[in-house]
Amino acid sequence: MTERIRNVALRSKVCPAETASELIKHGDVVGTSGFTGAGYPKEVPKALAQRMEAAHDRGEKYQISLITGASTGPQLDGELAKANGVYFRSPFNTDATMRNRINAGETEYFDNHLGQVAGRAVQGNYGKFNIALVEATAITEDGGIVPTSSVGNSQTFLNLAEKVIIEVNEWQNPMLEGIHDIWDGNVSGVPTRDIVPIVRADQRVGGPVLRVNPDKIAAIVRTNDRDRNAPFAAPDETAKAIAGYLLDFFGHEVKQNRLPPSLLPLQSGVGNVANAVLEGLKEGPFENLVGYSEVIQDGMLAMLDSGRMRIASASSFSLSPEAAEEINNRMDFFRSKIILRQQDVSNSPGIIRRLGCIAMNGMIEADIYGNVNSTRVMGSKMMNGIGGSGDFARSSYLSIFLSPSTAKGGKISAIVPMAAHVDHIMQDAQIFVTEQGLADLRGLSPVQRAREIISKCAHPDYRPMLQDYFDRALKNSFGKHTPHLLTEALSWHQRFIDTGTMLPS
């Protein structure tokens, strides 16, 4: 471990996780590293959860406000949720136990745009940060903190926190050192902010390590534990069909000179649909691709390996166990092709617009006019959060939403008369793709958009119902610009809640 903690003076701060966890008090605001299940602290949260459970058994209160980069893993969100140790959570979560706490009303939750979290923290929206808890690959001779498999909001939390706890994780590959690009300009401060001088996805503008006043470092914990690295389902026929429509669209846009032959910087969400698209791009005609995204997932890693993609910039990895092992074994090959940045840079709307990114994101549902619900099932039950989809959707050159046309074995339609919750308004959604087809909505009015979405994207089981609703709304709506029948616009959702299906009996 001495080669991991190369600053001799800081070795005296090494202690067990149990001791470090005692620094975290009831009511503290704690900012941690971690983004899409990568690079989050693992041992101190487990020790903290045990202390919380013991306090609760004594009838004492012991909860914290937990602010991260994005989702973490079972050792952090899972353990603290089991202990009922979080009274407020932001900005993104995928842990099932934490999700249950949120949807039961036991943990307050706000799914902020990921690109805005650092700025909100600097502005004091989350309160005063008592603790920054970050995972590191190593600590350099001059006290620099080498991040691990994500960057997230770590630098901002280190700047703001009164005390710092560092987990130095030996499981993380030491060759991660040098892969990060931490810009030390004023990204998120007020009242003025510096322009982040990125004009190409492959550009480095900062340094390789996080910086913090060493006097703030209160504890260093040695760990050896892997990231979440959840497996991805192999793309099914539905995902492959969606990918096929999108690849044909890209080819058409190149022929029309609306896209260059190498496309534009790609942003992609995670999951089997996203991986199917990336797999298709790996086999397709486009070369010298670049990624400017928030995550690097299996499909993007495969494109880097094949040479189809030359550089990928993000804030984090989100890999299957197999892909994580692959990159660990071949880090000397991949490290020159990857840049990990803080998330208020990876998700900066200004950079996204400057680079002209192509944004590809999933959704829970969209209405017939193209308003998108990415977060709340039936309008009220939180799934994960808006993540970075809002950062990219509004500012990208192309904003694309991908989804199977149905869910729950056909019991839910992804295209509905009115979205039960809206994360992305119609002005931020240009292209919709389901396994039924692709709707290009650029330059269309709401009525024209509805005709395209219903005919191109809706499932045949639901298409006649949508067409009937739209036809009657055209005749009887209060206004004819965006026709709706308010007495039945959300009736599909209520039918599912009442009967378990959106289809009428």
Swiss-Prot record:
Induction remark: Expressed at intermediate levels during the first growth phase, when ethanol is metabolized and acetic acid accumulates in the growth medium. Up-regulated during the second growth phase, when acetate is catabolized.
Consequences of knocking out this gene: Cells cannot grow on acetate and have lost the resistance to high levels of acetate, a characteristic of wild-type A.aceti.
Pathway stated in the Swiss-Prot or TrEMBL entry: Metabolic intermediate biosynthesis; acetyl-CoA biosynthesis
Class of this enzyme: transferase
Binding site for CoA: 269-273, 364, 384, 388, 408
Entry GO MF terms: acetate CoA-transferase activity; acetyl-CoA hydrolase activity; transferase activity
Xref: InterPro entries: AcetylCoA_hyd_C, AcetylCoA_hyd_C_sf, ActCoA_hydro, ActCoA_hydro_N, NagB/RpiA_transferase-like, Succinate_CoA_transferase
One of the GO BP terms on file: succinyl-CoA catabolic process
Reaction catalysed by this enzyme: succinyl-CoA + acetate = succinate + acetyl-CoA
Signal peptide feature range: none
UniProtKB keywords: Transferase
Pfam family, one: AcetylCoA_hydro
Cited Gene3D superfamilies: Acetyl-CoA hydrolase/transferase C-terminal domain, Glutaconate Coenzyme A-transferase
Effect of residue 294 to A: Abolishes enzyme activity
EC number(s) stated in the UniProt entry for this protein: 2.8.3.18
The keyword Transferase appears for this protein: yes
Regulation: Subject to competitive inhibition by coenzyme A (CoA).
Positions of the catalytic residues: 294
Function: Utilizes succinyl-CoA to convert toxic acetate to acetyl-CoA and succinate. Required for growth on acetic acid and for resistance to high levels of acetic acid. Also has low activity with acetoacetate as substrate.
Complex and partners: Homodimer.
Family the entry assigns: Belongs to the acetyl-CoA hydrolase/transferase family.
Name of protein: Succinyl-CoA:acetate CoA-transferase
Organism: Acetobacter aceti
